[in-house]
């Protein structure tokens, strides 16, 4: 990514996003930063700037392998760059109730992480795949789709959790 190449030689490169958000963060209740699944400099910037992190876990074969690496990265970020970083929760995504593998992943994640797992599960949905290709959020693309209702449910769950 071009931005990662630009940041490589910058001093305090891990804090660039945090510094950029400083002037606007009080204007919002939530600022969502969607990161690529890689653990590069942009993700490190996001974790350094964040108050909390939602960890998406696809209900697929290698999902739990990547989770371990991400949890280790979060621990490192907490230790070095952002001691206040919390894990908001684990979000199960791309769930298909017809597939045994999806159900097994849900069971494993819930068994090992219990209360850290959001009750909301994002089901596999064609509209969720189509929305980005039209440059739209799922809410703008099709607010009545199962994907939209899943994400609205997640938003309500997070708001309720943080209002207690």
What label would you give each PLM region?
Residues 123, 129, 139:
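Nucleotide phosphate-binding site architecture
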Residues 132-150:
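C-terminal boundary of histidine-terminating zinc-finger modules
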Residues 16, 41-42, 69, 133, ...:
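Generic alpha-helical secondary structure signal
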Residues 5-8, 100, 139-143:
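Acidic, proline/glycine-rich intrinsically disordered inter-domain spacer in sigma factors
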Residues 14, 64-67, 148:
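Short, structured helix-loop boundary elements
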Residues 154-164:
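C-terminal alpha-helix
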Residues 22-126:
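Conserved catalytic-core segment of NTP-binding enzymes
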Residues 1-26, 81, 131-134:
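P-loop/Walker-type NTP enzyme "switch/lid" segment
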